[in-house]
Regions:
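Terminal (and in a subset, N-terminal) low-complexity or junction segments at the ends
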Residues: 2-205, 211-716
């Protein structure tokens, strides 16, 4: 074998203990200039660190090749940029250019590419302007990177100027230039211009199709992205590569389209694209956004390689789909792996703790963030505040807000605390904070109004809620379905059912299930069967398989003793394979979480708790408690109804708390559904008889029971 061939096949090429140029000076054969360049090119390809790169740079400087071979100089520049050393890259670029009458296109394009890839738009444009002033030939490799820089920084005007230059130079119909134009116009939101260029292209390769698909996906136009993806394959016969699959998977995830998720996953599997990390991550995220965490976990478990994005996607998928416990278990696996949690991981896990609502878990995770010395930016700070509010520690949330420097608070900071006040029934405090927010010059957004309207609803502040709703129109904040749902809920809870119904009829667009659902809940609270039928009819057209709406209507019928209608609804559910969500409650016991539900035969404390509940029922009756039998939604005898009420999951959890948790320690219970009227009444009596503070978090809000009263003032 030729000596050079032997050297090129040898690994590693660099002796870390000797200068690189010694490899050349000690060689026993004469190199031709061409063979030396090949040698260095191979060294550069295998170079994977800045120290090795500096050795190569030094050797090229010693031999003089750094100035006589622009190609090698360009490769060094590319490598410096790759290792985030743009200053050294630019210094080399300037030193090489001194040796020439004017810069070469290749070197300028290389430096422009380096700047564009890291989003340094103004440096990119300055260098582009320098090329034009010095008469350096601007070609079809220059424009795409200039467009990329403009796209990353949303510079529409500059992008259009460069577009004009490209047309004057005759590159307007070049494939690479057109692909760059599609990208810059799409990212800047100019979809008419973008689509016009795309449609007028004489030839469209995979890069152009992918650019257009990605543009639609990133602009949250998933339907258009999916149509183009199918057209590209079916009409043009082009096979999607990994970049296209990543974009279309994101589009399918935005749509929550389970059927197309299966199709995209199948395509990626058949073409072996799923083995690429970026594709595997996108397929995983797609399934979680479609609500299929089982399929996502299967993808995750089969991945040969995982990075922090893989872990975060799966953790986020569990959390967003209400499987926070699974997220906590997976987080433990992550800590045992080689992958280190990041601030993004922390943000996801704080949300998981907030979803579960257990204070000791939230505190533990907060301690983990501090011990890991993670930077707590405003987003993570807001998430921690939200977590404490949702874990029942409103005082901690308020203190956390006050501890954020005013200059570091954003609208989200205010929104979180307004929402926290609302969840705990402190409507007036929420309104005061809302006023303070505006006084400090922070503009309320649609999230703010959702929080403040909800706070007014839970506190029964009808007039104030109406004013806030009118304020939205004054500030030109777009009215969304969620805002109408909040107002309908507010009016409905106050018994103003007709006004709530009139508001729905006046909506400019068809009401969503959230709006009709708020009305149906109000009808259940106030026993309005006729209006409830109207709400239920609309709901079951929009969401025919939503179990909760069947249950609400069934409860309305049951409260009116319409057992025949109850039976019909239950039969409809059975025929559709729908099951009523089982009520369950959980209680914090030290650092443990215990669950209770009526049919639980395996709870180790079952007999003790049932016995305690029976004694509690007697004590409460002696204090004046009367069971609300309308909450027993079964066609049975009165005494059977009373016995059934005693075994509601939240009552069992509170009975356990009275039995096992030391006096002076707050009893904290979480229920997955709305607490019923009878349990609400019972907890007031228990808090008075035993002088205990009981905090119950149900599906809608917090109830703080103490001394025989509730923080909601019986308005929930």
């Amino acid at each position: 074998m030729h000596r050079l061939g032997s050297l090129l096949s040898h690994k590693p090429l660099l002796n870390p203990r000797a200068p690189l140029y010694s490899l050349i000076s000690s060689s026993t054969f004469s190199y031709s200039p061409n063979s030396i360049e090949i040698f260095y090119e191979h060294l550069l390809k295998s170079c994977n660190g800045s120290s090795s790169l500096k050795q190569i740079h030094s050797a090229l400087t010693t031999t003089g090749l750094i100035t006589t071979s622009p190609h090698l100089g360009g490769q060094i520049i590319i490598k410096y940029a790759k290792f985030d050393d743009l200053n050294r890259a630019r210094l080399l670029f300037d030193n090489i250019n001194v040796c020439y009458d004017k810069p070469t296109s290749f070197l300028c394009n290389t430096m422009i590419r380096a700047y564009a890839n890291v989003g340094q738009c103004f440096e990119t444009l300055k260098l582009y302007s320098f090329m034009r002033k010095t008469g350096t030939f601007v070609n079809n490799y220059t424009y795409p990177f200039v467009f990329k820089a403009c796209a990353l920084n949303l510079l529409v005007r500059e992008g259009k100027v460069v577009h004009g230059d490209a047309l004057k130079k005759g590159f307007g119909s070049d494939l690479y230039v057109e692909a760059g134009l599609v990208d810059v116009y799409a990212k800047c939101g100019l979809f008419v211009d973008c689509r016009k260029i795309f449609d007028e292209m004489s030839t469209k390769d995979l890069v152009c199709w992918t650019a257009m698909i990605t543009a639609y996906e990133q602009a949250e136009k998933p339907e258009e992205a999916l149509v183009l993806f199918k057209k590209m394959q079916q009409e043009e016969g082009l096979l999607a590569d990994s970049i296209a699959v990543v974009s279309v998977a994101s589009a399918v995830g935005q749509l929550g389209d389970v059927r197309n998720a299966h199709t995209v996953h199948g395509y990626a599997f058949r073409k072996s694209l799923i083995e690429e990390l970026c594709v595997g991550n996108s397929i995983l995220a797609m399934h979680t956004k479609c609500g299929n965490t089982e399929k996502a976990r299967l993808v995750f478990d089969m991945m040969m390689e995982r990075d922090v994005i893989s872990w975060n996607s799966m953790l986020s998928g569990y959390t967003q789909n209400g499987q926070a416990t699974e997220a906590l278990l997976l987080f433990d696996e992550m800590r045992d792996s080689d992958c280190q949690p990041t601030p993004v991981t922390a943000l996801i896990m704080v949300s998981a703790c907030a979803y579960l609502g257990f204070r000791h878990l939230g505190r533990k995770f907060h301690d983990f963030i501090v011990d890991s010395r993670m930077e707590i930016d405003t987003n993570l700070s807001n998430a921690l505040m939200d977590m404490y509010a949702k874990c029942g520690d409103l005082e901690k949330a308020v203190n956390w807000f006050n501890g954020i420097p005013p200059t570091e608070r954003n609208a989200g900071s205010w929104n979180v605390l307004i929402s926290g006040y609302g969840m705990h029934g402190h409507g007036k405090e929420a309104l005061e904070l809302f006023s303070r927010m505006q006084e400090e010059g922070v503009e309320p957004n649609h999230f703010t109004f959702t929080s403040i309207l909800s706070a007014c609803s839970h506190a029964g502040l009808i007039d104030e809620g109406r004013k806030c709703f009118a304020e939205m129109k004054r500030l030109s904040v777009t009215l969304e379905d969620k805002h109408h749902a909040c107002v309908v809920d507010m009016l409905g809870r106050a018994g103003l059912l007709q006004e709530a119904f009139d508001l729905i009829k006046e909506m400019p667009s068809p009401p969503s299930d959230g709006v009709w659902g708020a009305l149906l809940l109000a009808c259940k609270i106030h026993g309005n069967m006729e209006l409830g039928k109207t709400a239920a009819s609309n709901l079951l057209q929009l969401e025919p398989n939503h179990t909760g709406y069947y249950v609400l209507m069934s409860n309305i019928y049951a409260a009116s003793n319409k057992w025949k209608e109850v039976w019909k609804l239950r039969q409809d559910m059975k025929n559709k394979g729908l099951k009523k969500p089982a009520a369950f409650s959980m209680i914090e016991y030290g650092e443990h979480i215990l669950g209770f539900h009526t049919a639980d035969q395996e709870n180790p404390y079952r007999h003790e708790v049932y016995k305690k509940m029976e004694s509690l029922a007697i004590e409460m009756k002696m204090a004046g408690y009367v069971p609300d039998l309308s909450c027993a939604l079964h066609d049975v005898e009165e005494e059977d109804k009373e016995r059934m009420l005693n075994y509601h999951s939240e009552k069992l959890a509170v009975a356990f708390g009275v039995l096992k948790i030391d006096p002076g320690i707050v009893i904290r219970v979480t229920k997955n559904l709305r607490v019923c009227n009878d349990c609400h009444s019972a907890f007031k009596y228990i808090s008075h008889i035993y002088q205990r503070k009981i905090i119950v978090r149900d599906a809608n809000r917090f109830h703080h029971f103490q001394g025989g009263t509730c923080s909601c003032k019986d308005y929930w």
